[in-house]
Amino acid sequence: PFNPLVPPPSPLREGRDEAFNMLLKLYDKNNNPQDLQRIIDILNDGGLIIYPTDTMYAIGCHGLKERAIERICRIKEIDPRKNNLSIICYDLSSISEYAKVDNNVFKLMKHNLPGPFTFILNGTNRLPKIFRNRKEVGIRMPDNNISREIARLLDAPIMTTTLPYEEHEDLEYMTDPELIDEKFGDIVDLVIDGGIGGIEPSTVVKCTDNELEIVRQGKGWLEEN
């Protein structure tokens, strides 16, 4: 079972003034550019953030920085050799940089994104080696302005995974940013408060080998052309 005390504290937070606020309030639009730049700097430095999506709060890092990805894998107890990893992209053109997208899949994604879906596609060699162990990558383009704006400003994908959760836990520790910060604040570099989050995961759609399969029905209902 996940124990938030087991992973080491974030190296980026060590030595900082305790008064330095690690819970940052953001809004759908008109955010302070300095606040956004602070997030980008953390990600570029290999740091981890917790942030809202159109489904649930997630842990994220720079999607091309392997050490940061490894930190998230340790926190989530993910074996990248056995589990698909997912990234958030800003738009469809950036998706095609990191995943192989044929015409049919492109039309399907264009019809359903942004939205609460994870599309499983074959990855390209632009992804770090840790992704290429399984040759597939989950693609997210959430209908959430905060997460997409971060991806746009970062000019790179965000490696993303939902928060660790145990069945007996109060759901507020998955949805309330202040409680999320209380539980996970010591093992990430910043928690972004985007309001109360959801509890329903994304719908996972596998689009490899010329087949389409709903692997997990979640919040999104897929509309085919």
Task: For each feature predicted by the language model, list its residue ranges.
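Active-site-adjacent structural elements in enzyme catalytic cores
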Residues: 21-225
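Ser/Thr/Pro/Gly-rich low-complexity, intrinsically disordered segments
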Residues: 7-10
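Glycine-biased, low-complexity coil/linker segments
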Residues: 13-15
